[in-house]
């Protein structure tokens, strides 16, 4: 059955990637966000060394405002932060003993999950099947809210509106650290 069996979040995300680009390239945040969205990626190819990206600044200094960066430079700033995010996800999954649960498919949500190459890199770091989450078949949902950046809030709202009544057909792992076993907490 398709049902949510685990959910969590990390404290870092796409805004941190934008901030890294902004400080690394010394450009305004709105320009960094545009570059991340249009030219971002996590896997560099040989062509990325030749692809030049024009960056328009807003300082009034012509030489500083009209600069070019290679796509490889952009990826070189983005990838370390994405790796940090995915490693944090990996540690959360390990702490939750996710590998003992029957479904081991990970759904990435949020705007940064759309960065090209994210699914492949996530699969390598997390060692799991990964897919991009997006709200599908939601009647009345505005077009602007159908992307992965809205998948988590829309999905949680749907989950709350239509709770799953059926019982799980697997045992949850028990915590070994003296706390209430997870199984008992779920029965509560």
Question: In which residue ranges do the predicted regions lie?
Answer:
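Helical "lid/coupling" subdomains associated with nucleotide-phosphate turnover
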Residues: 2-188
């Amino acid at each position: 059955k398709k049902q949510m069996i685990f959910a969590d979040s990390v404290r870092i995300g796409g805004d941190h990637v934008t901030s890294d680009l902004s400080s690394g390239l010394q450009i305004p945040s709105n320009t960094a966000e545009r570059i991340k969205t249009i030219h971002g990626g996590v896997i560099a190819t040989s062509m990325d060394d030749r692809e030049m990206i024009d960056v328009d600044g807003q300082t009034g200094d012509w030489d500083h405002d009209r600069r070019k960066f290679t796509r490889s430079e952009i990826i070189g700033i983005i990838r370390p932060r994405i790796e940090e995010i995915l490693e944090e996800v990996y540690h959360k999954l390990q702490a939750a003993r996710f590998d003992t649960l029957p479904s081991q498919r990970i759904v990435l949500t949020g705007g940064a999950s759309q960065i090209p190459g994210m699914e492949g890199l996530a699969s390598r770091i997390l060692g799991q099947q990964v897919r991009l989450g997006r709200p599908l078949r939601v009647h009345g949902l505005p077009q602007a809210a159908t992307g992965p950046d809205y998948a988590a809030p829309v999905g949680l709202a749907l989950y709350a509106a239509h709770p799953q009544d059926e019982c799980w057909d697997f045992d949850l792992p028990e915590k070994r650290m003296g706390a209430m076993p997870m199984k008992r907490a779920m029965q509560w």
